[in-house]
Amino acid sequence: MSKDLVHPSLIRAGIVELEMAEETTDLINRTIESNQAHLQGEPLYVDSLPEDMSRLRIEDKSRRTKTEEEERDEGSSEEDNYLSEGQDPLIPFQNFLDEIGARAVKRLKTGEGFFRVWSALSDDIKGYVSTNIMTSGERDTKSIQIQTEPTASVSSGNESRHDSESMHDPNDKKDHTPDHDVVPDIESSTDKGEIRDIEGEVAHQVAESFSKKYKFPSRSSGIFLWNFEQLKMNLDDIVKAAMNVPGVERIAEKGGKLPLRCILGFVALDSSKRFRLLADNDKVARLIQEDINSYMARLEEAE
């Protein structure tokens, strides 16, 4: 047999490539036709148009009548209560949040504490909301108070008469007790704010060392490495568990450096089966206690 013969598999491969090329060309032609569909009509020559064509306007009479009727029905007082898209207060507020967020990230990258950055950030947001967003609401409340002042004065006069008549009754002393119920609410709100700030400081320090590996004693009288990523937990869950470590809340409140190896070992012993299998639990417990004692001693020396 001659060596110039072509193998049948090569012929089949060439036929397949030809078919694919034909399909590709058909697809390209269809795409070109669809993109040039607006050019398939009769051409319009600008020179053939009349001179006054630029002054002509095409209007829909039915739509125009509907809009005119709607404009007549709506009063000017109702139009003042609605803002157009250009006057939406949320757009500049979003821009403000983006700006201060970028500044906060820069401050955190420079090494500034999370507690200080967050307190300054919250003050800026409160100031912006009180000056730019709450102004319209305050105007509405002032107008309502001015309108209701006469009726309020009459009702207050009647109430003063009733109080003067009932002052001599000893059973009415309960009604004149001072409003001390407001104080616990304020204290609880401040306590919640402080707890959120402390948790934020813990989350910041844990997130910075999320992939850093720490040494722990193993069962084989050696050591092994472990980090927060191997816990397979959310940052919020890690922070909640870390708040149970003695002394962590106090150190975070003072803005000091947290015992991260102690926190990692405490959370891992509580939530990771693999860590408990690898680690010598007694030695890890002693290691946690030693870290707590050393960090608390440093905090007392700093105070």
UniProtKB/Swiss-Prot annotation:
Region of interest (Disordered), ranges: 50-87, 139-194
Motif Nuclear export signal per UniProt: ranges? 49-58
Q: Which residues carry this modification: Phosphoserine?
A: 211, 272
Keywords (A to Z) from UniProt = Chaperone, Host cytoplasm, Host nucleus, Host-virus interaction, Inhibition of host innate immune response by virus, Inhibition of host interferon signaling pathway by virus, Inhibition of host STAT1 by virus, Inhibition of host STAT2 by virus, Interferon antiviral system evasion, Phosphoprotein, Viral immunoevasion, Viral RNA replication, Virion
Where composition is biased (Polar residues), the residues are: 143-158
| SUPFAM superfamilies associated with the record | Phosphoprotein M1, C-terminal domain
Q: Which GO terms describe its cellular component?
A: host cell cytoplasm; host cell nucleus; virion component
Q: Where is the composition biased (Basic and acidic residues)?
A: 52-69, 159-194
An example Gene Ontology biological process: symbiont-mediated suppression of host JAK-STAT cascade via inhibition of STAT1 activity
Report the leader peptide range: none
InterPro entries in the record, alphabetically?
A: PP_M1-like (IPR004259), PP_M1_C (IPR037199), RABV_P-like_C (IPR049506)
Q: What is a single molecular function from GO for this protein?
A: RNA-directed RNA polymerase activity
Q: Which superkingdom?
A: Viruses
Q: Which Gene3D superfamilies match?
A: 6.10.140.1560, Phosphoprotein, C-terminal domain
Q: Where is the composition biased (Acidic residues)?
A: 70-82
Motif range for Nuclear localization signal? Answer: 212-215
Query: Which Pfam families does the annotation name?
Result: PP_M1 (PF03012)
* Post-translational modification comment from the UniProt entry: Phosphorylated by host PKC and by an unknown kinase.
**How is the quaternary structure described?**
Homotrimer when phosphorylated. This trimer is stabilized by binding to the L protein. Binds soluble protein N, and ribonucleocapsid. Interacts with host STAT1, STAT2 and PML.
Role, per record? Non catalytic polymerase cofactor and regulatory protein that plays a role in viral transcription and replication. Stabilizes the RNA polymerase L to the N-RNA template and binds the soluble protein N, preventing it from encapsidating non-genomic RNA. Also inhibits host IFN-alpha and IFN-beta signaling by binding and retaining phosphorylated STAT1 in the cytoplasm or by inhibiting the DNA binding of STAT1 in the nucleus.
Protein family membership: Belongs to the lyssavirus protein P family.
- Listed name of the protein: Phosphoprotein
User: Whose protein is this, by species?
Assistant: Mokola virus
